[in-house]
Structure formats: C-alpha cells, structure tokens
C-alpha cells in the first residue's frame, strides 16, 4: 500500500512541473485576447462618439 502512495505522489509532482512550463503560452494567448478586446472597445466607442457629434451638430 505504501508503494502505491509513493507512485501517486510522484505522479502528481511531475504533472505540476509540466504545467508550469506552458505558462508563457497561456500568457501570450491572454494578451492577444486583451488586445482584441481593446480594439473592439476603441472601435465601438468611436462610432458612439461620431453619432453623438452628428446629433449635436444637427
């Protein structure tokens, strides 16, 4: 029974170390998504501002 516990604990330790190596990929994907959202926000806000200005000028 003790051997099984040792095998399980070593398995989980290896798995945790592997997941930390891919963090840069996750960070890159998140920054891409944030950049896309910022572009969408800038585009939609500029349309709103343009409509508001045309209403004020009319």
Swiss-Prot record:
Protein origin, superkingdom: Bacteria
Family matches, as InterPro entries: SpoIISB-like
GO terms classed as biological process: sporulation resulting in formation of a cellular spore
Keywords: Sporulation, Toxin-antitoxin system
Family: Belongs to the SpoIISB antitoxin family.
Function description: Antitoxin component of a type II toxin-antitoxin (TA) system. Antitoxin that binds toxin SpoIISA and neutralizes its toxic activity. Upon coexpression with SpoIISA in E.coli normal growth is restored.
Record note on quaternary structure: Probably forms a complex with SpoIISA neutralizing its toxic activity.
Protein name per its UniProtKB record: Stage II sporulation protein SB
Organism: Bacillus cereus (strain ATCC 14579 / DSM 31 / CCUG 7414 / JCM 2152 / NBRC 15305 / NCIMB 9373 / NCTC 2599 / NRRL B-3711)
């Amino acid at each position: 029974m003790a051997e099984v516990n040792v095998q399980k604990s070593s398995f989980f330790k290896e798995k945790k170390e592997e997941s930390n190596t891919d963090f840069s990929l996750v960070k890159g994907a998140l920054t891409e998504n944030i950049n896309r959202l910022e572009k969408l926000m800038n585009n939609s806000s500029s349309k709103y501002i343009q409509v508001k200005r045309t209403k004020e000028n009319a």
